[in-house]
Structure formats: C-alpha cells, structure tokens
C-alpha cells in the first residue's frame, strides 16, 4: 500500500562463486549437475529395459509397464523413479547420502507412468514438509 514503509528483507550473504552466489544457489547448482549426470547413468537404462515390451503393428515400437498401476505406456509417458528418494542437498553433510541414493543400482529404480510418478513425488514432498515442521 502507498505511504507505508515496507520492511526490507535481510540480505542473504553471497559467500560462493566470488561473492556472486548465495549458499542456496551454490547447492542448487551442484544438485542440478548431479541430476543431469544421473540421466546418463547405466542403471537407469537397465531399469527401463526391464519394464519394456515390443509392440507389433503400432507406430511406436516399445511400451513400458508402470510399476505402480501395471498399465503399459509409450516411452515419452514414463519416467525412471528412485524407489528411495535421493533426498535433499542443502549442505556438505547431505552430499554422501544424496550421491549414494541418486546413483543407486537398478534394484533401487522403477519405471512409473507420469501420473503415478507425480502422485509419488507429491506424497514424498508432503511427508518431508510434515517432518520438517
């Protein structure tokens, strides 16, 4: 509203990347780089191969079975999910567990259709919020 002074937010210290990044930005950058590297990790391909079947007479050649609803989907309609969530990466102490969970073997992964994956992700997010409170 006009005329009222608004309290300024406290400035977050920028201690990383030569004083340009906050701690949150720094850990977000590392988390993003690890997730990107994980997209090319061989067990992800193995998990998809285990859920795959050939389709004859369709425009698409393969379908993948969702581990949650057991329905069959095209490649673009499924995602590889970590059975045990990778967790958070907000500080140095989180790094070993995050990397261990992120780069798990094929038995720690499952193929889910996008709707089932979204439901699982939302449930995990709500659980994390409840535990953080």
Q: PLM features: residue spans?
A:
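The −1 position to Zn-ligating cysteines in a subset of zinc-ribbon hairpins
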Residues: 65, 79, 112
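Short Cys/His-centered divalent metal-binding micro-motifs
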Residues: 103-132
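Short, charged surface segments at domain edges that flank catalytic/cofactor-binding sites
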Residues: 7-68, 98-107
